Amino acid sequence: MIRPSSRPLIGVSACLKENGRGGWHHTVGEKYVQAALRAAGGLPVLIPAIGPEFGDDEPAFLEAMDRLLDSLDGVLLTGSPSNVEPHHYGKESREGTLHDRARDSTTLPLIRHTIDRGVPLFAICRGLQEVNVALGGSLHQHVHEVEGRRDHRSPKSPDMDVNYAPAHDIDIAEGGLLQQLLGERRVTVNSLHAQGVDVLAPRARIEATCCEDGQVEALSVPDAPGFVLALQWHPEYKALENPVSMKLFDAFAAACRARLAARATPMLRAAE
C-alpha cells in the first residue's frame, strides 16, 4: 500500500452535465479516477469546470488556477462525450453536436498555464483535442467524413470491453517521446472518437498516427519545461491489464512524483 503522503496529487478535469432534473453536476468518469489512483499511484482531485465564473477575466482565472497548481503534482485531462466548441478554432458547430462551454473555458486556459509552469500533463481523447486547440491548432469535427479517413468511432455496445477493444495500429514517430517510453514503433490501440486533429498546433509534435489513414493519435510539446503527453485513444480503460498503458502511466507518475519531491524540498528546509 502506498502511503498517502507519498502519493502525488493529480488534478482530474471535470465536465459540467445536466442531471435531467434541472440541476447540474461536475462529473468525472470512475475509470479516470481509478487510473489516477491505481495506475499513476496518485491522489485524484477533481478540477471543476468553473471557467464561466470568471467570464472574460482570464488573469483572475489564472490567478485562481495558480493557487490550485501550486498544490498539484500533475494534471489528467479526461475524455468526454462532449466536443470542444469550434469557435475556439474559427469554425462553426453543426446542429446536434454536444458541447461543454464550462469545460472549454476551464481547460483551454488551464492547459496553457499548466504547460508553461512545467506541471506534468497527461491528456486523453478530448484532452488531446483540447491541447491542440489550446495551443493554436484546429480539429476535424467529423473525422469519418474526411476523405481517406476511417471511422474512428466505437461500436455502441452495452459491453464496454467491445467498445474499448483494440481497433487499429498506430505508427510511432522515430526518436520521439512515445517511442522513448514504449520502446516500440507500432502498437495497437482502441478508438472511440469522432473528432480529431486537423491543423497541428505550432508548439505540438506528432508522436503517433493511425497506420490506416494517418490521423494524429498522439502529441507532445517539445518546448514544455515538464512532461506533456496527449493521446487520442483511451489508456485508462483497464490500464492495469495493459502493459502499453502502464508504461505511459508509469512515465506520468514518475513526473508527478518528481514534482512532489521538488515541492516538498522547500517545505522541509523551512521546517528545519
Q: Locations of the language-model features?
A:
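N-terminal beta1-alpha1 cap of cysteine-dependent amidohydrolase-like domains
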Residues: M1-F122, V133-H140, H144-L181, T188, ...
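Glycine-rich beta-to-alpha active-site loop
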Residues: A123, L128
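Active-site-proximal beta-strand elements of phosphoester/diester hydrolases
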Residues: L229-Q232
